[in-house]
Amino acid sequence: MRLYIDVETYRPRKEEAFTREKIIAIGILEDWTPYTPDSSKIWDEPDVRLHYFTEWELGEESRVVSQFYDYLGGLIRDWKSRRIDFINVVGFNILRYDIPLLTQKGIEYNVAGLAELNKLWYDAYTIDYFQTTLPFHDMRFKELNIKYLVEKAENNGIDVPEPFGSGRDVKDWYENKEYDKILKHLEMDLKIVRVIDLNYKQVYDI
């Protein structure tokens, strides 16, 4: 199965990434469909399932992190016992941001030690569409975002969901308790990455 992941955070100042940053929501999209472009037309359960771990429902960041790791650990155990054929963790900028932050928070909240958390992520094969897109963006980090990926896909004839807001909007939504907008933003980003993943050959024209 493919596990699409996106983490939303709150930090008062942009430059305080990782130092004064709180995980407020983790979005998960489970995909049990065949790994083909035709699967991007399938969105119904049980083939495709959305899950959220949010601070406003669970009460505090530590529970968001611990419940997420309980969930991921269960999937890894199912894979090792061969109840699941494979697990691919897929996202956008997850190698540089989401996974390091989740590892940091897992240690902070005593979910597990560094070696155990690293092994957990190592056991889940990872695809990061930020990294895979760099060669098609002249290896430039600036302006390489979800919006760029959507435009690239659309230019190559792929029907991609429209983004809802951006990561910059999350701070204001959180402060104004507009949690439904954060969830909508998560949902659309997850769906976008899924369509990109299923159609990667056409996206990159390869």
Regions found by a protein language model. Give the residues of each.
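Conserved non-catalytic scaffold segment of RNase H-like nuclease domains
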Residues: 1-104, 154-155
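Metal-dependent phosphoesterase core characteristic of DEDDh/y 3'-5' exonuclease domains
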Residues: 22-24, 32, 47-48, 84-184, ...
